[in-house]
Amino acid sequence: MRIDRAGWPFLAVPLGSSAALSVLGRVSDRRWARLAAWPFLALTAYLAVFFRDPQRRCDSAPPASEDVLSPADGVVMVAGEPQPGVAPEGDWQQVSVFLSVVDVHVNRSPYRGRITSSSYTPGSFLAAYRAESAHRNERSELWVQDGDRTVVFRQIVGVLARRIVTRVVPGDQVATGERIGLMKFGSRMDVFVPRECTVLVTKGQRVRGGETAIARWSRPT
């Protein structure tokens, strides 16, 4: 199982503690040390699952050129009209995906093109499923442009998530579904597409990052 590199510092402490206690238990024949190693081993296993980075179809085959893909695994919270006061200036549709603590937290670009803008906003740590988290929580906003097509997407942290990792900067070229970063421990992602796109998902639907088409351009490139 592939682990995102941001996860290794978190895995090192419980993994090292588990190993040290196991060795101590064997060398000194202390049963308590062997038993104490198990919770650390369980925590290591959970963190490994949390920071997992599975391959997706877009990693081996380019998606359809008109498709906008989900940037993350999770459940669709918003599909269609933007929440009040949330969308960037302009005429947009919104798709928001809520990530639970058991979902893959690696984030992917929903569409191809050049990163034209990147901004980070510090903020609160409200529950990510609450509407006001979109404009009050800590977040990172990225704009990607391909010709006359523009898609805006945001990484938004929640109650448990306390750090956003964004690995692209303005000027970078990204492919649809390409890895662009991750959010740690529960969060949401908002995607904004123009009115000319058709939203393909519905509220409550489960989606997979880099695989599920959440919107489609109405005209081919």
Where are these regions (language model features)?
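Short amphipathic, positively biased membrane-proximal segments
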Residues: 1-221
